[in-house]
A protein has these predicted regions:
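N-terminal, Lys/Arg-enriched amphipathic/low-complexity engagement segments
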Residues: 31-99
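Active-site and channel-lining beta-strand-loop segments
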Residues: 107-118, 122-124, 442-445, 450-452
Length: 510
């Protein structure tokens, strides 16, 4: 999204520049993989894979140019401390431009977007090989810094999937079939202003749209539509803000104006706490309700301060008094033309708490929508899912050998020795070692790590957002919240063998 034309080869960490000269000489192939070492919540360890296509479009598919090399080289001349020249693999990248038309000479295998996985499952694997004498194997983790950033859309996609699954249960309990479509709009993205960059808003906002359709982050909807073969993704409604409300001498006049400009049969959301939320509910709502109902408008009350749970419940009871309510076939109250949206103080767990309170109060889940801003797009970091890219295998001339990290002081950072494959067993992802005679087993014919890049574009077909949505909903519904069988018996054995070899080499306290 930047107009600065940033040199692509500088989009890595400085220490990556020296790594090609630090790996063992004579290596023929190096492999590394991306994984999540932890879940979003301990009580639900499911994770949604998302963000790979954008990484493909902006990182893997970007062809290296002579200008990239020249600009990087010029800047790096003064990057070293004490006036030392910062050495970097300029020669390898020059070969990429001269012999490979700028295409990155790596292979990348990845899971399908929308896959529901658990910690330790590899999301993608980077395969770097020597090609016709060119030492590209040593570029195995050069792109790690840039590719690592898919952690952010993965966190957001996971949050939205988790919320949808929870609200699905509430809808099943309290909403009639003809109103089930409203589930798509129950979580609305309010996060664009609360993120650190335009790109973050677009990419993480698009991740939200893999489970819901409601968004005020229009650039996210634009990207989602582009990734949906042009079929529109992302909807919203007319809504006021505090600046609109406080511009009028009388707040009720602002409310009336909002209803006036809303098309008949439309939706109008009005922020209700500019002065007194209680006054809005008791004084303004009885006045505006008949005006909205006369136009067939759904009038949505939006509290924006105070206790989120209490604000929603108070709003529902006030709407019931002002608009009236009917009891549906499932025994829950449905307000006639009124609703509440809570967008302040919302995170995943708080949303669950509100949804429980709404059900306990006897209201149908369709009567409440939720807006999430920073809690959806920004309040997260790389450690939210504890993502990492680690070397997993090396070929020093005698075939691939597994490599792993196993720090004695923090076993949670243990990585997996490769190479490996991911297969679905009973509908759940499981990791197997891929070596020896393992390929003779028919279970391994459907490796879920598919080649998306092989020293250039392949015939891999990216799925649409609609297809990704269906995969998430299907796999989430068929998965369990916690899975203790992520690693196959064979992978556990491989892990134990490699760990034992490490202990022999580096005994704790030795």
């Amino acid at each position: 999204m930047s107009t600065l034309n940033i040199p692509f080869l500088l989009d890595t960490d400085t220490y990556k520049l020296g790594h090609p000269r630090m790996y063992p000489e004579g290596a023929k192939e190096l492999r590394a993989y991306f994984t999540c070492r932890g879940p979003l919540f301990d009580d639900d360890q499911r994770i949604v894979v998302y963000g790979l296509r954008y990484a493909f479009d902006t990182i893997l598919s970007r062809r290296i140019t002579q200008q990239d090399i020249d600009e990087a080289d010029k800047w790096l001349q003064q990057h070293g401390v004490a006036n030392t020249i910062m050495e970097w693999p300029k020669d390898l990248w020059q070969i990429v431009v001269d012999k490979y038309d700028g295409y990155i000479p790596l292979q990348v295998k990845a899971l399908r977007e929308g896959s529901v996985i658990y910690p330790q499952v590899p999301v993608f694997e980077i395969v770097a090989r020597e090609i016709d004498g060119d030492q590209f194997q040593y570029l195995v983790t050069y792109l790690e810094t840039a590719l690592m950033r898919i952690w952010s859309p993965m966190v957001t996609a996971t949050k939205s999937a988790m919320v949808r699954a929870y609200l699905q249960k509430k809808f099943d309990n309290s909403v009639e079939d003809d109103a089930m479509f409203l589930l798509d709009s129950r979580l609305h993205d309010f996060g664009s202003r609360g993120v650190s960059s335009q790109e973050t808003a677009m990419v993480t906002g698009c991740a939200h749209l893999t489970s819901f359709d409601g968004t005020d982050t229009m650039i996210a909807g634009w990207l989602a539509t582009r990734y949906n073969d042009g079929k529109h993704i992302g909807t919203s409604v007319l809504a006021t803000e505090h600046s609109v409300m406080t511009s009028w001498d009388q707040e009720i006049d602002a409310v009336k104006r909002a209803v006036e400009i809303t098309p008949s049969g439309g939706i109008c959301s009005v922020v209700a706490d500019s002065y007194s939320y209680n006054n809005f509910l008791t004084q303004h709502l009885p006045i505006v309700a008949p005006l909205a109902q006369a136009k067939g408008i759904l009038f949505v009350v939006r509290p924006d301060s105070g206790d989120p749970v209490q604000c929603v419940i108070d709003g529902l009871y006030a709407c019931e008094r002002a608009f009236g309510a009917d009891v549906n076939a499932k025994g829950f109250k449905v307000i006639r033309g009124g609703a509440v949206i809570q967008g302040d103080g919302i995170n995943v767990k708080k949303l669950f708490e509100i949804a429980d309170a709404v059900e306990a109060a006897g209201f149908s889940a369709q009567c409440v929508a939720y807006g999430m801003g920073g809690g959806l797009l920004q309040k997260q970091d790389r450690d939210t899912l504890k993502v990492a890219i680690k070397l997993c295998a090396i070929d020093l001339g005698n075939g691939l050998e597994g490599r792993m990290k196993k720090p004695s002081d923090d076993i949670s950072k243990t990585s997996l020795p490769g190479p490996f494959i991911v297969n679905n067993v009973s509908g759940r992802p499981q990791v197997y070692p891929a070596y020896g005679n393992v390929w003779e087993d028919t279970r391994f014919e459907n490796n879920k790590l598919e080649i998306i890049w092989d020293c250039g574009p392949t015939d891999y077909i990216w799925e649409t957002i609609d297809q990704i949505r269906k995969r998430i909903q299907r796999e989430w519904a068929n998965s369990v919240s916690q899975n203790n069988e992520v690693l196959s018996h064979q992978m556990e054995l491989r892990l134990q063998q490699t760990a034992a070899a490490i202990r022999d080499k580096y005994p704790v306290g030795g």
